[in-house]
Amino acid sequence: MKKLCTALLLSLFAISFAHANETKQIVLKVKEMNCQLCAYLVNKELRNINGVISTKASIKDGLVTVVEDPNVTNQQLFDAIHKLKYTAEVVN
């Protein structure tokens, strides 16, 4: 049983590590994002994109960190933010 649990944990770790290597992170500056509702809407719109894994918006900095698979394009992110009548630019 102990060997089975160890093997299972190692497998999960290997899968997680492999998945981490298949993602990229991008930081966007969204100038119009200045309240909690704005941040919520930006997060929601970006998470609707197929391939976006997670987002984290900071209204203090006006930045959104997006973790995505490599197939997601910057234009897809810009288009999603533009639906809210906001503008975005890549910071990193």
From Swiss-Prot:
Alphabetized Pfam families for the sequence: HMA
Naturally occurring in which organism (per UniProt): Haemophilus influenzae (strain ATCC 51907 / DSM 11121 / KW20 / Rd)
Residues that span the membrane, as ranges: none
Keyword Metal-binding: yes
GO MF: metal ion binding
Binding residues annotated for a metal cation, in chain numbering: C35, C38
Alphabetic keyword roster: Metal-binding
Entries under SUPFAM superfamilies matching the protein: HMA, heavy metal-associated domain
Domain HMA: 24-89
Coiled coil, from the record: none
Name the record gives this protein: Uncharacterized protein HI_1050
Keyword Metal-binding: yes
InterPro entries assigned: HMA_dom (IPR006121), HMA_dom_sf (IPR036163)
